[in-house]
């Protein structure tokens, strides 16, 4: 699994743990809903700025987004 797919799966997992829909998270983070959906499917290469917005919206440290991600 690519790093982008692992990261997307991790974001989806954290979003679901907060019981947020993609729409909820996109509004809270200020990130386009379609972009966020693509990100969760591993189709985007997000910047640190975008990842930080998502982490803040999920109320987690940025490093939490990378937990469990294995380098290929």
Regions found by a protein language model. Give the residues of each.
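Short, charged recognition helix plus adjacent turn
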Residues: 1, 64-72
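Short basic helix-loop element that most often maps to the first helix and adjoining turn
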Residues: 9-28
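Conserved hydrophobic/aromatic packing and binding residues within compact polymer-binding modules
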Residues: 11, 25-26, 36-39, 65
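Residues within helix-turn-helix
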Residues: 23, 34, 52
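Recognition helix of helix-turn-helix/homeodomain-like DNA-binding domains
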Residues: 31-44
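DNA major-groove recognition helix of helix-turn-helix/homeodomain DNA-binding modules
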Residues: 49-64
């Amino acid at each position: 699994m690519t790093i982008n797919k692992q990261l997307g799966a991790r974001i989806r997992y954290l979003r679901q743990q907060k019981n947020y829909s993609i729409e909820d998270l996109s509004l809270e983070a200020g990130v386009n809903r379609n972009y966020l959906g693509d990100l969760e499917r591993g189709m985007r290469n997000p910047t640190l700025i975008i990842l930080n917005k998502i982490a803040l919206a999920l109320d987690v440290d940025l490093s939490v987004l990378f937990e469990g991600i294995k380098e290929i």
